[in-house]
């Protein structure tokens, strides 16, 4: 779908599967290799750029970005100014960084984008609050999953496709995934301190998900992927028991459920682990 049609596709009852293509960082290799193909095929997408990096080594410059911007195919999305680990910073530093990027967007493109992509896909409740206050309508993480009308507008999932996870076979699997519809996931803050690591995770699913009790979840607790210990504490409330702390920068949980005709429901959760 074209980014300009994202809102109507988000709220409509989607009977047909649709894809929104997003590209992070604005690397020169994308401009040289992928852009000519996407332009020829008239495939729309969002290109998220960090304003500090524009024009530096191996990154696109503003002239190239303007070319995409004026093509009618591309939305230039905001990816912060510095692309640092902002989630670990205090709110003032986060806000000033994003304000700087907005200023440059207005100077170079005549407007800021309504789309934001969190650097490294990392966010907290505080970071989300800042993004909402600064006027962004949508924000994307890097946790895997399918967008539907139950998803939080400021923590939208995406399936990463890169040099590590870019095989055509995987892509064909991804386009046969379906959403898990849910009311909420707790804890709501995806930023974990040492005091609440590991978290007590609960997913409050919407009604009428077929075969929900057959769901499987996996987590990378203790830096080792393993099948999670799960149980339904109520009919549609799943508890995921994480026995070991998440180690490193991120903790991940992926849940899946096989549907008919080779389709899968998929839901990913990403936690950011505080430095201290």
Give the location of each predicted region.
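Generic alpha-helical secondary structure signal
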Residues: 10, 122-124, 144
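Metal-dependent polysaccharide deacetylase catalytic core of the NodB/CE4 family, i.e.
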Residues: 1, 15-19, 27-127, 137, ...
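Acidic, His- and aromatic-enriched active-site or binding-groove loops in soluble protein domains
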Residues: 136-145
């Amino acid at each position: 779908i074209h980014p300009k049609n994202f809102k109507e596709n988000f709220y409509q009852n989607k009977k047909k599967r649709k894809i929104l293509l997003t590209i992070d960082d604005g690397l020169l290799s994308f401009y040289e290799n992928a852009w000519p193909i996407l332009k020829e095929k008239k495939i729309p997408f969002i290109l998220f750029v960090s304003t500090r990096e524009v024009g530096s080594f191996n990154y696109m410059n503003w002239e190239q970005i303007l070319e995409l911007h004026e093509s009618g195919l591309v939305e230039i999305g905001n990816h912060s100014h510095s692309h640092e680990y902002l989630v670990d910073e205090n709110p003032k530093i986060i806000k000033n960084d994003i304000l700087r990027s907005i200023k440059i967007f207005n100077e170079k493109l005549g407007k800021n984008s309504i789309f934001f992509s969190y650097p490294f896909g990392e966010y907290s409740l505080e970071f989300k609050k800042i993004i909402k206050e600064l006027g962004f309508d949508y924000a994307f993480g890097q946790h895997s999953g399918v967008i539907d009308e139950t998803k939080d507008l400021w923590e939208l999932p995406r399936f990463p496709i890169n040099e590590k996870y870019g095989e055509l076979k995987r892509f064909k699997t991804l386009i046969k995934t379906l959403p898990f519809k849910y009311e909420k996931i707790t804890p709501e803050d995806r930023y974990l301190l040492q005091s609440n690591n590991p978290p007590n995770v609960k997913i409050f699913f919407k009604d009428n998900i077929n075969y929900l009790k057959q769901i499987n979840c996996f987590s990378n607790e203790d830096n080792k992927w393993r099948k999670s210990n799960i149980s339904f504490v109520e009919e549609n409330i799943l508890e995921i028991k994480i026995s070991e702390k998440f180690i490193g920068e991120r903790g991940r949980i992926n849940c899946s459920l096989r549907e008919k005709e080779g389709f899968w429901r998929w839901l990913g959760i990403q936690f950011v682990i505080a430095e201290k």
